[in-house]
Swiss-Prot record:
Superkingdom field: Eukaryota
Main location: plastid
SUPFAM superfamilies: HydB/Nqo4-like (SSF56762)
Primary gene name: ndhH
PROSITE patterns: COMPLEX1_49K
PANTHER family: NADH DEHYDROGENASE [UBIQUINONE] IRON-SULFUR PROTEIN 2, MITOCHONDRIAL, NADH-UBIQUINONE OXIDOREDUCTASE 49 KDA SUBUNIT
UniProt keyword list: Chloroplast, Membrane, NAD, NADP, Plastid, Plastoquinone, Quinone, Thylakoid, Translocase, Transport
Organism: Daucus carota (Wild carrot)
Pfam family, one: Complex1_49kDa
Protein name (database record): NAD(P)H-quinone oxidoreductase subunit H, chloroplastic
Length: 393
């Protein structure tokens, strides 16, 4: 009897760009030796839309509706970073009420983003039930967004010097009710998932990143904090009104997929704490800076006849960006979202460089999956949390 023939050559497998676990149009060229991953090459660019070049041919106000298409699951953060840049260039003060409203919207958006990470992540490793649970809570957040901004997604709510509109009557009470309800749901998630032996088998010790390694790769957000580095831009940069609230940076030291899950689950609870404090302490006053018209420093009576009335409460659509360089950043759900802006005394930016957290965090994927099993690719990729809209831009 002859022995069965064996093959020693490697197999190359294409995963994506339509694979349901790719979280968008990501393509992985995976080299396999049986079930063992030898190499993995991510192929990007299927969702490239030229967002940086579009920004260089638009005024800031014209460009605002575009930015919600970067990370379309956390649109408040892309809006925040877009208005923060000209606010710093023009030294524009944001009223306290507007700053509190911004914090509330940002943290609600963080919770919604983490929820839509949790559901697909659990589905990737075989747990379908949480995928349906998270839409129950996410729907309530989108109802709050719709009541305040008029849109469930792509809100276009942030403005230079404030926000587009004040909170509607009764919105604060509804948001407080949601916070109380959501805390019970997070407890339910933890009971259902955290100590589940099958879940722990899939994530514990999988995709380990050390603290120094995370820094060297430029990782940020939960990817960095799960490796033992307590770095959160809300604490570091003191932007908006985060210093006025009592909350803590959530972190773990193990650096594996389980640690990244625990960081995000804890961050949702901390976000609720911030929202509750902001809702209870929100002050009266304007929701936008009524002095933004000072962008134009040149006194021109003829220009003033028409346009002073036109921009009495809004920034001019054609204000000039001063000739300087500026880097601004916020702590988005996926990590550090930044913009490098170069003004050239024109109405369009000379350079608008986007620093998306998902693009940077994705670079470590080939190193994490080498010498792992094929099934672990889904676990590791899901724990990174990427959205191809911001990766490809």
């Amino acid at each position: 009897m002859t022995a069965p023939a064996t093959r020693n050559d490697l197999m190359i497998v294409n995963m994506g760009p339509q694979h349901p676990s790719m979280h968008g149009v990501l393509r992985l060229i995976v080299t396999l030796d049986g079930e063992d991953v030898i190499d993995c090459e991510p192929i990007l660019g299927y969702l490239h839309r030229g967002m940086e070049k579009i920004a260089e041919n638009r005024t800031i106000i014209q460009y605002l509706p575009y930015v919600t298409r970067w990370d379309y699951l956390a649109t408040m953060f892309t809006e925040a970073i877009t208005v923060n840049a000209p606010e710093q260039l023009g030294n524009i003060q944001v009223p306290k009420r507007a700053s509190y409203i911004r914090v509330i919207m940002l943290e609600l958006s963080r919770i919604a983003s983490h929820l839509l990470w949790l559901g697909p992540f659990m589905a990737d490793i075989g747990a379908q039930t949480p995928f349906f649970y998270i839409f129950r809570e996410r729907e309530l957040i989108y109802d709050l967004f719709e009541a305040a901004t008029g849109m469930r997604m792509m809100h276009n709510f942030f403005r230079i010097g404030g926000v587009a509109a004040d909170l509607p009557h009764g919105w604060i009470d509804k948001c407080l009710d949601f916070c109380d309800y959501f805390l019970t749901r997070v407890t339910e998630y933890q009971r259902l998932i955290t100590r589940n032996p099958i879940f722990l088998e899939r994530v514990e010790g999988v995709g380990i990143i050390g603290g120094e390694e995370a820094i060297n790769w430029g990782l940020s957000g939960p990817m960095l904090r799960a490796s033992g580095i307590q770095w959160d831009l809300r604490k570091v940069d003191h932007y908006e009104s985060y210093d006025e609230f009592d909350w803590g940076v959530q972190w773990q030291k193990e650096g594996d997929s389980l640690a990244r899950y625990l960081v995000r689950i804890s961050e949702m609870t901390e976000s609720v704490k911030i929202i509750q404090q902001a809702l209870e302490g929100i002050t009266g006053g304007p929701y936008e800076n009524l002095e933004i018209r000072r962008f134009d420093k040149v006194w021109d009576p003829e220009w003033n006849d028409f346009d002073y009335r036109f921009i009495s409460k809004k920034p001019s659509p054609t204000f000039e960006l001063s000739k300087q360089e500026l880097y601004v950043r916020v702590e988005a759900p996926k990590g550090e979202l930044g913009i490098f802006l170069i003004g050239d005394k024109g109405i369009f930016p000379w350079r608008w460089k986007i620093r998306p957290p998902g693009f940077i965090n994705l670079q470590i994927l080939p190193q994490l999956v080498k010498r792992m099993k094929l099934a672990d690719i889904m676990t590791i990729l899901g724990s990174i949390d990427i959205i191809m809209g911001e990766v490809d831009r």
